[in-house]
Amino acid sequence: MTPATNTVLFVRSIFHPSDFSKASELAFAHALAIALFRKTELVIMHAGGDHVGDWAQFPPVRKTLEQWQVLAPGSPRSAVYEKLSMSVTKVSAKGDPVAASIRHIERQKPDLVVLATRGRHGLPLWLKPSIAQAIARRTTAMTLFVPSGCRGIVSMEGEIQLRRILLPIDDHPDSHEAVVRAVRAAEVFGDGTVEIVILHVNGEKLPQYVRPETQACSWKELRRKGDAAVTILEVAQNADLIIMATEGRHGVIDAMRGSVTERVVRDAPCPVLAARGETGFE
C-alpha cells in the first residue's frame, strides 16, 4: 500500500444479502475473498417469508475456505477468526428481504455491499426507485455488482484473476477517489502488474487525474466517441473489473436509476464496483 492510496480506506466491513440461488454463488465467493484478503467483517443475510431461513442453506463458509486451501479440512468454526483473522456472521430474518436488509445496513454501516445481479433479466429488487431512495439515505457504502455467469475476479475454486481494470471518468467529478480505489484493488488482488485503463467518452480532452505512486499498476488512456454505456461495455470486453463513479449527493443506489452505471451493470461481462463521488455519470 502506498502513502497516496492509504488516504482512502478500502474495506473494513462487508454486507452480502443472499437469496440462496445459483446466481448468488459467485457474488458470495467475491464477498468471502475480499473479507479474507482484508481480514475484516462479513455479514451474510437471508430474509423472506414467515419464518427464518434454514441455516444449512447458507453458503458454506468453512467448506469453501477449505476448498480454497486456506483452512485445513475439518477445521472448527473458531478457526475462521483464529487462523484467518476474519469475522463471518450469518443473519436470517423474517419478512420483506429489502426492509430487513435496510435495517441491518443501518446497524452494521458496511463499507461494501456485494450484490448478485441477473444481467439482462434485471437488476436486484434494491434498484426499484422507492427502494433505491430508502437505501441511498441510509448507506454511503460502495456496491460491488457481480453478474451471474460473468468472468469474476474470484472463481468458485478461489482462483484470483485481476489483470485489467476499466475506469471511466467524466469531465466534472473529482476522480481522485475512484483512481485510488482502482490502485488499491490492484495492490490487494492484482495478478502481477495490473493495467488500469482510463476511459473518457465524448470529451475533447482527458480530464485531469492524479496517478498514485505504485508498482502494482500500468496505465493506459483512451478517448472514445459514442453512446457512453455502449462504449464502456465495448472497452470492458477485456476487463476484469469496472469501477464507476456515481452521484455523491444521492448515494450509490439512487444514482443508478436510469443512469449509465445501471446500463453498464445490466450487460457487464465482469463485476462492477459503484463508488460515490462528488458527481458522476448520470
What role is predicted for each listed range?
Residues 61-71:
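A short acidic, glycine-rich active-site loop
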Residues 31, 100-101, 182, 228-232:
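Generic hydrophobic alpha-helical segments
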Residues 2-60, 159-223, 235, 241, ...:
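Small/aliphatic-rich secondary-structure junction motif
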Residues 24, 94-95, 125, 225, ...:
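A conditional alpha-helix N-cap/helix-loop micro-motif detector
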Residues 86-90, 219-221:
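Rossmann-fold cofactor-recognition segment
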Residues 1-10, 33-37, 102-154, 237-282:
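Gly/Ser-rich helix-loop-strand patches that form or flank binding pockets
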Residues 92-101, 223-229:
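Charged docking surfaces used in two-component/phosphorelay signaling
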